[in-house]
Curated annotation (Swiss-Prot):
UniProt entry keywords in alphabetical sequence: Metal-binding, Zinc
UniProt family annotation: Belongs to the aldolase class II family.
Protein name: Putative aldolase class 2 protein RP493
Transmembrane segments: none
Organism this protein belongs to: Rickettsia prowazekii (strain Madrid E)
Cofactor notes: Binds 1 zinc ion per subunit.
InterPro entries named among the record's database cross-references: Aldolase-II_Adducin_sf, Aldolase_II/adducin_N, Aldolase_II/adducin_N_sf
């Protein structure tokens, strides 16, 4: 399907799942080898995003098509620099919820204590908080370096970045990361008890099984999300 159609749908799905944060987060997508990407106009709520109002932005942050409400320097730096460094990445979701932010602030990070979390066993990166990403050279380089070759990164004291080779793969990672973070927060809110954590052997086997369970990761779920929002 059309990239703009699917990206607009992703915004609506994120809003439906309450994974938006008013106007403060952003999702983007591009075609393979493209030197530009699509992203929403900073200032809209996710429910308001349509194929018609998506912006076309160069990897250097120049608006090529569309009308913006406010120049989102931080957002354009994040998306543009990841796309430059990672030709395999065709979709980037940046979001922050109470659960993802809470887990990002824990020194232990995301623990392998649920099947949701095991999707990311030894496959998640961390980026230390350094205010807004406004220094194109210094901060953006560190951002990309911290992501490494992973598709998911927790931003300490801030939230998360989820990437994908497709929009539906990025959505898949986002949903499972949020469920994993919620579960960990629930456990942290209970009386301190010793946690049952699967062995390293089981964790390694499970992440391999989970990520090879379907040929096109997230596609089945994506089609269900589209039916849910009537798109």
């Amino acid at each position: 399907m059309d990239i703009k159609y699917n990206l607009a749908a992703a915004y609506k799905i994120m809003a439906y799942l309450s994974l938006d944060d008013h106007t403060y987060t952003h999702l983007s997508a591009r075609s393979k080898n493209a030197d530009f990407y699509y992203i929403y106009p900073f200032g809209l709520r996710f429910e308001e995003v349509t194929t018609e109002n998506l912006l076309k932005v160069s990897l250097d942050g120049k608006i090529l098509e569309g009308e913006e409400y406010q120049y989102n320097k931080t957002g354009y730096f994040i998306h543009g620099n990841i796309y430059k460094a990672r030709p395999d990445v065709l979709a980037i979701f940046h979001y922050h919820t109470p659960a993802s932010t809470a887990v990002s602030a824990l020194k232990c990070g995301l623990l392998p204590i649920s099947q949701w979390a095991l999707h990311f066993y030894d496959r998640i990166s961390y980026h230390d908080y350094n205010s807004l990403v406004l220094d194109a050279d210094k901060q953006s380089t560190k951002f990309v370096n911290d992501l490494k070759q992973n598709y998911v990164m927790l931003l300490r004291n801030h939230g998360a970045i989820t990437c994908g080779k497709t929009i539906h793969e990025a959505m898949f990672y986002t949903y499972h990361l949020e469920q994993a973070c919620k579960t960990q927060c629930l456990l942290n809110s209970t009386i301190q008890q010793e946690l049952i954590i699967p062995s390293v052997e089981i964790c390694k086997k499970t992440v391999k099984d989970l990520l090879s369970f379907e040929e096109d990761l997230g596609k089945r779920d994506w089609e269900a999300w589209l039916r849910l929002i009537n798109m």
